[in-house]
């Protein structure tokens, strides 16, 4: 159905949402697309291969239940498949949803599709990763530059203010990839000019590819003091490379996101720490924003869903446990 006005119940994203546990990955979330008596919101994410997206889906489903709307939740097979994601976005548009949530793999490529949505009067909510467009009515996401700067701050604290480090980043086309790279690099340049960033590689968020890239970096730079992985797949790839080369305890690894593998790596001392987002909150706030847009409410241009640094010293704190996803 289209442009149905309905009231929005008050609701805040709390730790209870996350503590309820993550649903398994898959194609559709609640509902199947455009029921007769509920507004329909189509969500197109960046993928399903990481536990992060399963947690985003869970938050979206919780909001759908709370606000009595129907949603679908889809994403490409990998976070490198921009073409598949755009096909899914077109399919979502063809269903005539009341609103669309979109997490862009490429911040520029989706422009014509977003224009279709605007021309059809379909409000677009960007989530996790924004786009180079003013068409989305809001973006629900982590402040990725600030989060990456926080990761860099801890890198400096751990390796000192001199030496060589490197980055394995998930991509250089999405806003998240760009911001998590630039936020980290800019902090190092401004606050620790004695640290040299010897390499930045892009692994598409793929764990195996990131492992190979990290191994090549480590073999080319035996005096490396630290590596930063910018998302779940990148960070675990770095951990795997360190383990396979027998370099445990010889350099500092800092990650981004959560997931059981990173939690285990921190607990086991293979990773110094990581930034965790609030993925359930991202999914929840995306659906909530769509509901409010359909009800004619004015939304802020960004909805900051927050981030936290976690390591072995605070991983069991209730505040951290509430935003870790497994």
Task: Show which residues each predicted segment covers.
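A residue-level marker of the well-folded mature domains of exported/periplasmic proteins
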Residues: 2-8, 17, 22-326
């Amino acid at each position: 159905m289209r442009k149905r006005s309905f009231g929005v119940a008050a609701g805040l994203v709390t730790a209870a949402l996350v503590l309820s546990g993550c649903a398994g990955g898959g194609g559709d979330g609640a509902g199947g697309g455009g029921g007769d008596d509920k507004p329909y919101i189509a969500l197109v994410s960046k993928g399903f291969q990481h536990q992060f997206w399963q947690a985003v889906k869970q938050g979206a489903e919780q909001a759908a239940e709370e606000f009595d709307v129907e949603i679908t939740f889809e994403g490409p097979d990998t976070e490198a498949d921009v073409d598949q994601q755009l096909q899914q976005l077109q399919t979502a548009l063809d269903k005539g949803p009341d609103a669309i949530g979109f997490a862009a793999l490429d911040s520029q490529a989706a422009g014509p599709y977003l224009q279709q949505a605007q021309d059809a009067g379909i409000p677009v909510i960007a989530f996790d990763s924004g786009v180079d467009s003013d068409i989305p009515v809001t973006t629900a996401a982590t402040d990725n530059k600030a989060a990456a700067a926080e990761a860099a701050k801890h890198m400096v604290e751990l390796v000192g203010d001199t030496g060589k480090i490197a980055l394995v980043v998930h991509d250089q086309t999405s806003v998240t990839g760009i911001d998590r790279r630039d936020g980290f690099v800019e902090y190092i340049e401004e606050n620790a000019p004695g640290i040299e960033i010897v390499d930045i590689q892009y692994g598409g968020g793929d764990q195996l590819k990131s492992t190979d890239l990290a191994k090549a970096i480590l073999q080319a730079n035996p005096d490396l003091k630290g590596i930063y992985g910018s998302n779940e797949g990148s960070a675990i790839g770095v951990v795997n490379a360190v383990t396979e080369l027998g370099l445990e305890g010889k350099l500092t690894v800092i990650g981004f996101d959560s997931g059981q593998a990173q939690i285990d790596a921190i607990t086991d001392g293979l990773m110094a720490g990581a930034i965790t987002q609030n993925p359930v909150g991202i999914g929840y706030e995306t659906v909530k924003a769509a509901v409010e847009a359909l009800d004619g409410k004015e939304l802020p241009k960004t909805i900051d869903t927050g981030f936290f640094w976690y390591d072995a010293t605070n991983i069991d704190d209730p505040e951290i446990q509430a935003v870790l996803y497994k």
